[in-house]
């Protein structure tokens, strides 16, 4: 068993790549180590293309094993179940990073599995998994010539931090992941605290500069440990077939792409496709028999060439806009009467209905990871039903990877403006229902989430808007597109989503399909996105620019009290009897903590006010010189104990009672008396006198 090893340094941390010791039956197998973190990444490549495959079936699975952190899983079975959302997001991150490096038309199935075997809690293992995926591919024999690497960058006190640990990230204004080849940026994912575009661009370029070290190490490992290149074929469009279709139908296709409406355009294109199929099947084009798949792919290539050339020649886009124009926007809030907050955001043929729901601490999501269980106060969910694109399909199923990814992007875009628990004790769930989709539904979700939360009275620091940018590039000619359509995303070279406030960027997500994205293009895209974002924010601000001061009448009420910690036991009572009594009487939900914090959560203001008043009565402090109406709780030979407030009693001597002209033999437990607090000694004992009638 021969083991090959490569060692390099990344941000003052040593990283070790090793192959030959584990999972040797996989085509590629690499362990990546950093400190006490160990990630095993395997690659298996199918040697032939499955019948009927017309796409690249790449699948990436990132898995965390709880034993890696010395823990036993929760749940009845005590074993790992389906991957968490965080694991799915990391799988997507790796997929998006490596997919562009494969040749067009390569349809062999590839499966990559990254398994976290050991975890020390200091450094997130996602970048190690990404590096391992690239290394295992490089030695697998797959056609993976442009090796990819990825790094994380933080930003604190005006300085970029390479490969930050988790503590660094807690103090950082930026969490940026960049992946790419030696000469090209392929993928960007980030969350930021409203940073200027210049800082974001600087972070991307800083990250790319440090990819070379990783790529060189992977190349050295591949040079000594790589398996022979597999034999494979590349599917290519039949050029003669394409020319025949173009000669007969190009005019019709060109006219169809002057129709601005997506539905009408698709109806026209479907009719042309039908005619194309009939023409090819009924005529002997070149003596060959073509499949429907081959014909439609040639047709699609003509569409792609047409749309791209029109844009590069300065002609109007598919819907008639120029490169920088944003589609018409319509904003409404409070569209649903029975919810806590709602907004309907429509941009062209993309529409998001976003609803905000307020809850208590008990509604917070508990997220289990290798770091333990974390309480999540802000949840954002994204739903993409088939009717949003005029199709039939499965409804009510678990969210797909794409839905999870879009929800996460929208959440990261708005996380920077979300209030902390001290400022806003509610738990918040935002749900985006995509009602129509023709590009940039995730950015519509960002805009709608901001509007919906403000409608619900959530005190976000600033409104947030998002925009999706595109790119068409051919050699030195290029065009950056603002607010791209679905077709422009599909037929273009870049999908660059930018979200932020009027002050700066809160989230970036970029996927690039080609090489050679220059600094100039990135600068233009960021600046064009900034102008577009401010335009969108201006329209949103005309409807609502600050959160509502009060929550909706149908929203629950919450009140936070800070009392003397010693009084918590009085609020709770023996065996919880006191707090249970308050809950039963008022219907409120009450949570207490040893620090003295009491949270009262109620369905309406009346219920909350009643519960707060009862708690205030229990915890109120007796004061000297004050008169109280109390009840006798205990009779003694020399006097009585009178309950004043909550569990606070005072002693009333018979001498004081007789002095006030009342007979002591007539006193009974439960009898009401009006008493004056004469003094409170150092031990907290209260002496009373009777107020004369």
UniProtKB/Swiss-Prot annotation:
It catalyses: RNA(n+1) + phosphate = RNA(n) + a ribonucleoside 5'-diphosphate. Involved in mRNA degradation. Catalyzes the phosphorolysis of single-stranded polyribonucleotides processively in the 3'- to 5'-direction. It is found in: Cytoplasm. Belongs to the polyribonucleotide nucleotidyltransferase family. Residues 556-615 form the KH domain. It comes from the Bacteria. PROSITE patterns: KH_TYPE_1 (PS50084), S1 (PS50126). Its EC number is 2.7.7.8. GO terms for biological process: mRNA catabolic process; RNA processing. Mg(2+) binds at residues 489, 495. Keywords: Cytoplasm, Magnesium, Metal-binding, Nucleotidyltransferase, RNA-binding, Transferase. This is Polyribonucleotide nucleotidyltransferase. Its cofactor is Mg(2+). Residues 625-693 form the S1 motif domain.
